[in-house]
Amino acid sequence: MSEEIIEDMLEEVAPQVAGDYPEIAQRYKAGEELTDEELDIIADVAISILRSILSHFDADNSPIDEYEGDEGELILDVTAPDLAVLIGRHGRTLDALQVMFSLLVSRKLGFRYPVVVDVEGYKSRRQDKVASMAQSAAERAIRTHKSVSLPPMNAYERRLVHIALRGNDAVDTHSEGSDPDRHVVIVAR
């Protein structure tokens, strides 16, 4: 991804979400809870950037549902027909979109706030599938007393596995390998 593309995207978005956010950044980095007003500002910035990206796919007028995820992250779910092109094969296009989007939001705000882009609930469905896969693998690891390796996953999905099993005292999880073959290993205690 070229720095020029990122800078061009930021210039496109800048007038729509003009502002300086050092106070929010300072409070967030200090671990303070952000106010509803500050969270609304972050959401406005993120939605403006997402709409700018969507305009390149002629989808900037698509509805965007905004809600809070289980881990406190802001989730923006683009809901419109014919957006499969934004998901891509096995979600790879959506993963690339997420990386670019996160970089743009971080650059604009001056700090990294967790904002997840979803399309038609794809990530939500995938999250359920990954959590189910993790639970099944944990049960198998406990039953067989052997380590169980899951298939290679991106960083987001590996994190979902670790989160899904962190409350299970009968297993430990860790990641092995390097991308694109990095995967989670589940070991019975």
Residue positions per predicted region:
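RNA-contacting regions in translation and RNA-metabolism proteins
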Residues: 1-189
